[in-house]
Regions:
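Active-site acidic carboxylates
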Residues: 1-128
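Structural recognition of alpha->loop->beta junctions
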Residues: 111-133, 194-226
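Short Gly/Thr/Asp-enriched flexible loops that form oxyanion-binding sites at enzyme active sites
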Residues: 170-180
Length: 226
């Protein structure tokens, strides 16, 4: 009896660690879908996960306040430019789905990203008036079929992505978009990254997939921005 209990106790941490790893991989995996049509040429802007749970976090993964304000200023400028050009703009929100994932978020992130929290809303300084908001439960925003359908209805074939986190949901959405044939640009000046090494790895991965990384001034790829 005691040996059985001891065995379970010893195995539990290893099993829990494996579950964490498997869950993280599932959440990070880019989705695949039907290729877009050839005549889809319109441009659109997607702003990812700029929610107060993340932008104004005070925990270990908190973003620098000045960097956050810089990114928000850039995003608002991109939104204004897209509106002036008559291009669609959409915002993406993260909501963790499932008790296990929400428990992990509570354990590791203080509950950030769990539904029903005041911090689940878009940042107070973001200009999202009149823009549709799509909710995702994993890194790739294309996991919500409504987003892809909305883009296809408007014959969008070119996407500019920005937001957070560059190493996770921006990366996942960029790769999910490329899997469907969208031409993708990531605006680094409007993007935030909590950790440098994962962000640099994501930059390499996105460039390999054909994503254009635009810096703040000359439009050239700028890994140094992260």
């Amino acid at each position: 009896m005691w040996l059985t209990i001891l065995g379970v106790a010893l195995a539990a941490p290893a099993g829990l660690a494996l579950y964490f790893v498997a869950t993280a991989r599932r959440i990070a995996r880019p989705t695949r879908g039907e290729p877009i049509v050839r005549d889809a040429t319109k441009a659109a802007l997607l702003v990812i996960d700029m929610q107060e749970d993340f932008t104004r976090s005070q925990g270990a993964n908190a973003y620098d306040g000045q960097e956050r304000d810089r990114a928000i200023g850039r995003i608002n400028a991109l939104v204004a430019a897209a509106r002036k050009a008559g291009e669609p703009v959409a915002f993406i929100r993260q909501e963790h789905q499932g008790r296990a994932v929400q428990w992990i978020a509570s354990l590791l992130l203080g509950g950030a990203g769990n539904p029903g929290r005041p911090g689940a809303r878009l940042d107070r300084d973001i200009d999202a008036d009149g823009c549709p908001v799509f909710v995702k439960h994993v890194a790739d925003a294309f996991s919500d079929p409504a987003l892809d359908a909305w883009l296809r209805e408007q014959t969008v074939g070119r996407l500019t992505l920005t937001g957070l986190d560059l190493a996770h949901c921006v990366r996942g959405t960029a790769l999910g978009a490329r899997n469907r044939g969208y031409r993708v640009t990531v605006d680094l000046a409007g993007s935030l990254a909590a950790r440098e090494k994962p962000a640099l790895h994501a930059v390499d991965e996105m460039e390999t997939a054909g994503v254009v990384l635009r810096g703040p001034e000359d439009g050239a790829p700028r890994a140094a921005m992260v």
